[in-house]
From Swiss-Prot:
Keyword entries, A-Z: Electron transport, Membrane, Mitochondrion, Mitochondrion inner membrane, NAD, Respiratory chain, Translocase, Transmembrane, Transmembrane helix, Transport, Ubiquinone
Source species, domain of life: Eukaryota
GO CC entries: mitochondrial inner membrane; respiratory chain complex I
Family matches, as Pfam families: Oxidored_q2
Catalysed reactions listed for this entry: a ubiquinone + NADH + 5 H(+)(in) = a ubiquinol + NAD(+) + 4 H(+)(out)
Topology versus the membrane: Multi-pass membrane protein
Subcellular location: Mitochondrion inner membrane
One term of GO molecular function: NADH dehydrogenase (ubiquinone) activity
Taxon lineage: Eukaryota, Metazoa, Chordata, Craniata, Vertebrata
Function: Core subunit of the mitochondrial membrane respiratory chain NADH dehydrogenase (Complex I) which catalyzes electron transfer from NADH through the respiratory chain, using ubiquinone as an electron acceptor. Part of the enzyme membrane arm which is embedded in the lipid bilayer and involved in proton translocation.
GO terms of biological process kind: ATP synthesis coupled electron transport
Membrane-spanning intervals of the chain: 1-21, 28-48, 59-79
Name of the featured protein: NADH-ubiquinone oxidoreductase chain 4L
Length: 98
């Protein structure tokens, strides 16, 4: 169980590092955020089943629902940005430009 937790924490850390490294492109950032949410989902589900805390067994499902909503909003933003500007650079998302 300890090696599984370590692998999931490493996956989360690598996805977080990916967000920090590839923050100029929106698509890369969205993929790294999805990796973070997936590793959190698996880690939460494993910890709940390991410690027999079935009173909070709906928490991973709620996290998965919020992750799907985040992915939908992110993809809508990606489509809108790429159709307006022709690329997925995050610099185009400055709302103070006129």
């Amino acid at each position: 169980m300890m090696s599984i937790n370590l692998n999931l924490i490493m996956a989360f850390s690598l996805a977080l590092a990916g967000v920090l490294i590839y923050r100029t492109h929106l698509m890369s950032t969205l993929l790294c955020l999805e990796g973070m949410m997936l590793s959190l989902f698996i880690l939460m589900a494993l910890l709940i089943s390991h410690f027999h805390m079935f009173s909070v067994s709906m928490a991973p499902l709620v996290l998965l629902v919020f992750s799907a909503c985040e992915a939908g909003v992110g993809l809508a933003l990606l489509v809108k940005t790429s159709s307006d500007y022709g690329n997925d650079y995050v610099q185009n998302l400055n709302l103070l430009q006129w």
